[in-house]
Regions:
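Internal alpha-helical scaffold of NAD(P)-dependent oxidoreductase catalytic cores
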Residues: 1-64
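Interdomain hinge/lid region at the active-site interface
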Residues: 49-118
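Charged/polar positions within long, soluble alpha-helices
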Residues: 34, 38, 68, 97, ...
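Alpha-helical scaffold segments in carbohydrate-active enzymes
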Residues: 28-31, 117, 121-124
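Long, positively charged, glycine-interspersed low-complexity recognition regions
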Residues: 120-142
Length: 142
């Protein structure tokens, strides 16, 4: 702990199980989603492959950055933390089904609620100084 504190890190003690579950949500699930989205984009009809690359918007580019991670490392993480990742994937699948249903039903109110709840999470991340665009994660005190 002293080592990390001297480097400017904040430390928190948690059990191995809690660590693995939290990381399955905050790191492993986003990687699964990124790999799936990029695979979906490139496995579209071949006639659109060049267009997908040429017109890739910020969202797809963000996912390709994540999906370009070391395959061997992520294979090992997915295997080692499979129990938690599968549990989180099941929850994600339910949310995705709800999202799909709202789109299919053209339920604008439900979509707005979904968007607003996730937008609030972003605000909380910024408030907690977890903005990763900065080299010090926004923690440096001026």
């Amino acid at each position: 702990e002293n080592f990390w504190s001297k480097l400017g890190s904040k430390t928190k003690f948690m059990t191995f199980n809690d660590h693995d579950y939290v990381l399955s949500l905050t790191s492993h699930l986003p990687h699964v989603v990124a790999y799936s989205i990029v695979k979906t984009a490139i496995n579209n009809e071949d006639k659109f492959k060049d267009d997908v690359i040429q017109y890739s918007a910020g969202g797809l580019r963000d996912f390709t950055r994540i999906a370009a991670s070391d395959p061997i490392m992520w294979r090992d993480i997915f295997i080692d933390n499979s129990k938690n990742i599968i549990s989180v994937l099941d929850k994600f699948s339910e949310n995705l089904k709800d999202f799909r249903k709202a789109i299919a039903e053209k339920n604008g109110d439900k979509l707005i609620k979904f968007f607003e709840s996730t937008k609030n999470v972003r605000k909380e991340i910024v408030k907690a100084k977890q903005e990763v665009n900065l080299p010090d994660f926004g923690r440096k005190k001026n």
